[in-house]
Amino acid sequence: MIEIKDKQLTGLRFIDLFAGLGGFRLALESCGAECVYSNEWDKYAQEVYEMNFGEKPEGDITQVNEKTIPDHDILCAGFPCQAFSISGKQKGFEDSRGTLFFDIARIVREKKPKVVFMENVKNFASHDNGNTLEVVKNTMNELDYSFHAKVLNALDYGIPQKRERIYMICFRNDLNIQNFQFPKPFELNTFVKDLLLPDSEVEHLVIDRKDLVMTNQEIEQTTPKTVRLGIVGKGGQGERIYSTRGIAITLSAYGGGIFAKTGGYLVNGKTRKLHPRECARVMGYPDSYKVHPSTSQAYKQFGNSVVINVLQYIAYNIGSSLNFKPY
């Protein structure tokens, strides 16, 4: 994550729904806002959230009475992506998870925050021929909010990972916010090699397989792309080896193969997957962030997480708009 000196959200309160690891919380707190409520149903995510923020999020959002939620200025929600992910079953609103958006809507209707800040998978934009996004947009408009949506890629905002997500920003209409802009992309100058742990800490991750085939030479220059160098086995999604002079593949909560969830990388002549701490760095989490002690849970959690830096840039621009200062 980046250091933000100009705290655009100072004095504002927010709630953290579908909180996961607390990525939204890190981003908004870095801009000066205060978290007054968190909600997350997964017990392992609750554990790591409490380890880092000293509070256990409330559980099942469908059972929460919206009237009991504290007043707030910004509602944050990276609502579940499994229902909309290309690697999932693509049911969306027909799946019970899909209807969790309506729990967001009923809280918005009751509490009327100034801003609603949502995140979802890229596929959300095209899901069900665009109807899913249309339902969200129409619902927010009915509740008297504007609706801004854009797909942004983490690699355009300082993070060496191809991770495209849709970000949805809604301002309450009576605020008459006309000047909101999504952050402008900039050239990447950090690559996977810059985020690696010392070899001595990751020796247990090294894979030595007889069916390892290197198909390409290591590259000399860094590049804002994934660069495949080789494969093991049949070369399926979790069996590919990449250069650390490029960017990381999209971290995933699911998938199989020897390098499942992170991809394989050629590091100082050896092949391995990423360490959970390296996954944290590739998502913008600071090294002060405590990772779940279960390695399998940690990989899953970062595969499901939000990218801190992208949220920080958006949060800053939200604050700029509320403070009537164009970015």
From Swiss-Prot:
UniProt keyword terms in alphabetical order: DNA-binding, Methyltransferase, Restriction system, S-adenosyl-L-methionine, Transferase
UniProt GO BP: DNA restriction-modification system; methylation
Signal peptide as annotated in the record: none
GO molecular function, one term: DNA binding
PANTHER family on file: TRNA (CYTOSINE(38)-C(5))-METHYLTRANSFERASE
Stretches assigned to the SAM-dependent MTase C5-type domain: 12-325
Biological source species: Haemophilus parahaemolyticus
Effect of residue 81 to G: Cells die, loss of methyltransferase activity, binds DNA about 3-fold more tightly
Coiled-coil intervals, chain numbering: none
Gene3D superfamilies membership: DNA Methylase, subunit A, domain 2, Vaccinia Virus protein VP39
Family listed: Belongs to the class I-like SAM-binding methyltransferase superfamily. C5-methyltransferase family.
Assembly with partners or alone: Monomer.
Residues forming the catalytic site: 81
InterPro entries assigned to the protein according to its UniProt record, in alphabetical order: C5-MTase, C5_DNA_meth_AS, C5_MeTfrase, C5_meth_CS, SAM-dependent_MTases_sf
The protein's name in its UniProt record: Type II methyltransferase M.HhaI
Reaction(s) catalysed (UniProt annotation): a 2'-deoxycytidine in DNA + S-adenosyl-L-methionine = a 5-methyl-2'-deoxycytidine in DNA + S-adenosyl-L-homocysteine + H(+)
EC number: 2.1.1.37
